[in-house]
Amino acid sequence: MPELPEVETTKQGIKPHLEGRIITTAQVRNRKLRLPVPLNLNELCEGKHITAITRRGKYILLHMDKGYILIHLGMSGHLRIVSQTANPQKHDHVDLHINNGLALRFCDPRRFGLFIYIDENPYQHPLLAHLGPEPLSDDFNSEYLLRKAANKSQSIKSFIMDSQIVVGIGNIYAAESLFLAKIHPNTSAKKITTEEFNSLTGHIKKILESAIEAGGTTLRDFYSSDGKPGYFRFALKVYGRKNLPCLVCENKIETVVIAGRHSAFCPHCQPIIT
């Protein structure tokens, strides 16, 4: 699933082509996504100015002079900027034609994404209203996490992947951040010390910033708006490296299932706290 760096990379890629432009046509080929694409999307969007493009967590918002389009890439989706004459492929579900001869094309093979219209304040929409702070903001710090973790017996990995605690951190970047902070992913959140939270928040911020600079992580499905893969996969220390030697201590990387997700870690660098 695209995480914060992949969504931010996508936002940055489409922004120069869309911001300040006018939507001339909205073309829907398949409405059946996680939430159905509005039947009247063309009526809602035609002639609207795109005034801004922002990101909230793993969501992209197209701000128009009236209304908003909320986009989520789901498990395998991506947005591309293409010529309006480019032939659509099998999983290209929605096109927004722009008054510069280009189109924003939404592709989602597994159809877990969404492409919906919101009339009112989008930040009050149920999908956004209860999200936690952005991990790259000043609001996300060790004091905040320490306060939220009080009496939380869930694993620290599940804790930082909870979008109501902090947005945008998925399996890849949670595993990498915990490795650098030397915290076992199954450690109870309430047992993490202030010093450890200081280390963890710092590493989360650094990893996300580095991943954004590298264009995100491409393992299978993610490509940026210009069709390029993300190169942060070459910097991964533990994710996807089961049974390979740790790059720090040379012990074998192991995995443990936490909340249904395989979590990679080094048993030597990240000892479990009992």
Swiss-Prot record:
CDD domains: EcFpg-like_N (cd08966)
Key words of the record: DNA damage, DNA repair, DNA-binding, Glycosidase, Hydrolase, Lyase, Metal-binding, Multifunctional enzyme, Zinc, Zinc-finger
GO MF annotation: an example: zinc ion binding
Co-factor binding details: Binds 1 zinc ion per subunit.
Coiled coil: none
Reactions listed under catalytic activity: Hydrolysis of DNA containing ring-opened 7-methylguanine residues, releasing 2,6-diamino-4-hydroxy-5-(N-methyl)formamidopyrimidine; 2'-deoxyribonucleotide-(2'-deoxyribose 5'-phosphate)-2'-deoxyribonucleotide-DNA = a 3'-end 2'-deoxyribonucleotide-(2,3-dehydro-2,3-deoxyribose 5'-phosphate)-DNA + a 5'-end 5'-phospho-2'-deoxyribonucleoside-DNA + H(+)
Quaternary structure, from the entry: Monomer.
Name of the protein in its database record: Formamidopyrimidine-DNA glycosylase
Organism: Legionella pneumophila (strain Paris)
Taxonomy of the source species: Bacteria, Pseudomonadati, Pseudomonadota, Gammaproteobacteria, Legionellales
